[in-house]
Amino acid sequence: GHAAAVGKKEGEGPLGERFDYVAKNDRMGQRSWELAESELQKTAIRLALRKATLPERSLDLILAGDLLNQCIGSFLASMHANVPYLGQYGACSTMAQGLALGGCLVESGAADRLLAAASSHFCSAERQYRFPLAYGGQRTPTAQWTATAAGAAVLGSEPVPNSAEPCDVRVTH
């Protein structure tokens, strides 16, 4: 199973109807942007497991990451699962990194079933990498916009119900 949970702005875009969950607001009922990002990732994890018809306890490992210091959003999203967690940080490549590493772990027999997840939040990314929103600086029309989104996918040695086709990772020169 796999799932994507997104913020309100992303849900209003051209892919809006393809997401599994669209938040009503970017705070998601939390007191900080970081906690909102964690809640978004937790939602994606739960939806991916539900689509795979698997309980959290069936996982050997969670590989997850985000753009926050010490991957705190992913840690908080994963700690409720009572499953070992390995934080990933690859910035924009975090999800691909988790899927590739997860595939290696499953293929080698080091794990039977695991979950890879990643998230980002526009407001926490602005605070950490650009200009805090409280600063009040005006954005140019061409300024980058970090997505408020999370994705999760279950990987396993046996076919996972409701899963996508297998994929290959290739190195090109």
Stretches with model-predicted labels:
Residues L54-P55, A77-H80, T94, V106-G109, ...:
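Solvent-exposed alpha-helices and their adjacent loops that cap or buttress functional pockets
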Residues A36-E37, P84-A96, A143-W145:
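Active-site nucleophile and cofactor-binding loops and adjacent substrate-binding regions
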Residues G1-E34, P132-H173:
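Condensing-enzyme catalytic core mediating Claisen C-C bond formation in acyl metabolism
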Residues Y89-A116, L155:
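Active-site-proximal alpha-helical scaffold in enzymes
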Residues P14-R18, S74-P84, V106-S108, Y129-Q138:
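A glycine- and small-aliphatic-rich helix-loop capping segment at beta-alpha/alpha-beta transitions
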Residues G65-Q70, C92-S93, A118-S124:
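Acidic, glycine-rich active-site loops and adjacent beta-strand->loop/helix elements
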Residues G1-L63, L67-S74, H80:
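Conserved active-site "lid/cap" helical segment
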Residues D112-T146:
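Flexible, glycine-rich active-site loops centered on histidine and acidic residues
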